Amino acid sequence: MKRVLTALAATLPFAANAADAISGAVERQPTNWQAIIMFLIFVVFTLGITYWASKRVRSRSDYYTAGGNITGFQNGLAIAGDYMSAASFLGISALVFTSGYDGLIYSLGFLVGWPIILFLIAERLRNLGRYTSADVASYRLKQGPIRILSACGSLVVVALYLIAQMVGAGKLIELLFGLNYHIAVVLVGVLMMMYVLFGGMLATTWVQIIKAVLLLFGASFMAFMVMKHVGFSFNNLFSEAMAVHPKGVDIMKPGGLVKDPISALSLGLGLMFGTAGLPHILMRFFTVSDAREARKSVFYATGFMGYFYILTFIIGFGAIMLVGANPEYKDAAGHLIGGNNMAAVHLANAVGGNLFLGFISAVAFATILAVVADLTLAGASAVSHDLYANVFKKGATEREELRVSKITVLILGVIAIILGVLFENQNIAFMVGLAFAIAASCNFPIILLSMYWSKLTTRGAMLGGWLGLITAVVLMILGPTIWVQILGHEKAIFPYEYPALFSISVAFLGIWFFSATDNSAEGARERELFRAQFIRSQTGFGVEQGRAH
C-alpha cells in the first residue's frame, strides 16, 4: 500500500513532475531515432519562438508578464499545459492501467482546486498584483517581512519541483530515447535557461501553449483509436478490459488507493489548496490584461484539463486491452517493459506504430522543458522582484532588477543540473508531496486571508505562515516516506504520508490567533487599509492593463 501511495504522490501535476511518473527501476531502452528527430524539431521551433520573443522583451513587464497581452484563451492553454505534465500523462494512465476506476477518481481530484482559484482568487489576484503573488499579500501589510516569507515559500516549492523535475527528465529520457541520464539532465537545464533568459514569460507561455496543443492532439488520437477498436462503446471498453485484467471485475470498484480517511483527506486538501498556492501557476494570472481575462483563463484551463483527464482514463483502459494482454510488450518475467508507467507509450506504438511512438515520446520530453521553464521564471521573479527590488535595494531600476533576475536564472539552472545529477538514484517522490504541502500551508492561507479577512495583520501572517511552512516540513520528515523509507528507521513518528491536513490547520489557526491578539498601532492601521484594498480588488481601479501593465 505504501508503494501505491507513493505512486499517487508521484502523479501530482504538479504537478508537473516527470520524476513522479517514473518510479522504481529504470531500464534503458534502445535509441529511438524517430523520437529524437521529432524532439529536435520541437526544440528548433521553440528556440525560434524564444528568438522572436526576445525581440519583444523590452521592459520588466514584458519579461515577467509578457506585457499583460496574453488572451484568456491563450493563458488557459498555458495553465493547462502546466498541469498536463509527463506525470499526469504517464502516471495517471498507468494508475488506470493497474487500478482501473480508482485512476479516474484520482485524476479528477486534480480539478477540485480550480473552482477555488476561479471563484476566490483569480479576479482579486489580478486586480491587486503586478508580477508575483507577494504583491497581493503585501498590498496593505509590511512589505519587507511579507515579501521575504512569500519569496521563501515560493523558492522552496520551486526548488523541490526543479530537483524532482531534473531527476525525472533524466529517467524519462533514458526510458523513451535511450540517451544517457547525465546528458539528458544537462540538455534540459541548458534549454530551460535559454527559454527563460532570452524570452521571459512570452517565450515560456508559447512553449506551454504549443506543448499543450501537441499533447491534447496526441492523447485525443490515442483515445480515438482505442474507442474505434471497441466500436465506440464504453460498455465494450470496460468489458474487454475486465476480461483480460488480472483483477477482473475489481478494476471497476473504487476505494482501493488510500489506506484510511485521514490520509485521503490530507492528500485531497494538499492537492486542492496546494494548487492555489503554486507560484508558477499564480504568476500566470498577471499575463492577462484584466480580471475578466483572468476568469476566462481559469474557465478554459479547467475545460482543457477535464478533457485531458478523461482521455487518460480511456488511454489507461485501452492499455489494459491492447498492451497488458500483448506479450510483445512484456519482458521475460511477464512485466511491462520499462515498468507500468510506460503503458501509455506502449499504447502509442500499438495504435499508431513507430512514428507515432516517436511523436508521443518527444511530446513527453517537451512537457518537462515547458514546466521547468515556468518554474525557473517563478523562482527568478521571487528573488529579483520580491527580495532584491522590494526588500534589499528599494528603488532599483528596471534594468538592475532584470539583470538580477537573469543572474538568478543562471544560478537556478546550474543548481538544478548539479542536484539532478546528485539525486540520480535517490527517492525524490516525497519532494512533490512536500512542495504541495508547503504551497497549501504557507502560500495559500496568506494569499486568501490577505484578500478576504479585514483583521489580518503582518504579525499574524508572518507567524502563522512560518508555522505552516515549518509544520509541513517537519511532519513530512517524521512521516513514513522520509523517516522509514529514506532514513531507515523502523517506525514513523508521524503516521501519515501527507501532512497537509495538519499543517494547513496550524497555518490558519496561527494566522487567526496572532492577528486577533495584535493590538499594536501598526495592526490597527493595516486593518483600516482593508477597505481601500477591497475596493481595488472588486473594481480594478488603478490596475495596470495591457502594455502599461
Curated annotation (Swiss-Prot):
Membrane topology: Multi-pass membrane protein
MF terms in GO: acetate transmembrane transporter activity; glycolate transmembrane transporter activity; symporter activity
Topological domains, Cytoplasmic: 56-75, 126-145, 206-211, 284-302, 373-401, 451-461, 517-549
Periplasmic side: 1-32, 99-102, 169-182, 235-260, 326-349, 425-427, 485-493
A GO CC term attached to the entry: plasma membrane
Keyword match Cell membrane: yes
Cross-referenced Pfam families: SSF
Residues annotated as transmembrane: 33-55, 76-98, 103-125, 146-168, 183-205, 212-234, 261-283, 303-325, 350-372, 402-424, 428-450, 462-484, 494-516
Main localization category: membrane
Cytoplasm found in the keyword field: no
GO BP annotations listed: plasma membrane acetate transport; sodium ion transport
Alphabetical keyword list: Cell inner membrane, Cell membrane, Ion transport, Membrane, Sodium, Sodium transport, Symport, Transmembrane, Transmembrane helix, Transport
Subcellular location: Cell inner membrane
CDD domains, A to Z: SLC5sbd_u4 (cd11480)
InterPro entries named among the record's database cross-references: Cation/Ac_symporter_ActP, Na/Glc_symporter_sf, Na/solute_symporter, Na/solute_symporter_CS, Sodium:Solute_Symporter
Database matches in PANTHER family: CATION_ACETATE SYMPORTER ACTP (PTHR48086:SF6), SODIUM/PROLINE SYMPORTER-RELATED (PTHR48086)
Family affiliation: Belongs to the sodium:solute symporter (SSF) (TC 2.A.21) family.
Annotated function: Transports acetate.
NCBIfam families given in the database record: PRK09395.1, PRK12488.1, sss, symport_actP
Name the record gives this protein: Cation/acetate symporter ActP
Organism of derivation: Shigella flexneri
Gene: actP
